[in-house]
């Protein structure tokens, strides 16, 4: 969903970046068919800036890989999440639209990203588990 929205916004002239915040299970790179040179570990451990780890995709969109299959990203501590948020805020001045694609659930990182966002789009499917999980997230907002 986030990739399709990003591509359509780019076609309409917006400068868009997608931040794949489904840590360790990131799939934006899979959807785009692009293997990024960098992922969030490079920001956290290798002193790369957020802008340095952006990979260019089709239609001019940028994306930041959450690291597909990188188990260390699945268990980020609060300090790492705060670092990501402080770097993410800088992108707001470089892009018209910053899309944060989080994983399902009510983890600390999901809540941090939801609370910092001026607008939230909650994707729900007609499956009972999706409806229940989405309602649970809405209740804690």
Question: What positions do the PLM features span?
Answer:
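Walker A/P-loop phosphate-binding motif and the immediately C-terminal alpha-helix
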Residues: 1-22
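Short, conserved glycine- and acidic-residue-centered signature motifs
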Residues: 2, 77-80, 130, 134
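Short, high-confidence coil segments that cap the C-terminus of an alpha-helix
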Residues: 14, 95-96
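P-loop/Walker-type NTP enzyme "switch/lid" segment
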Residues: 18-93
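Conserved catalytic-core segment of NTP-binding enzymes
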Residues: 97, 102-141
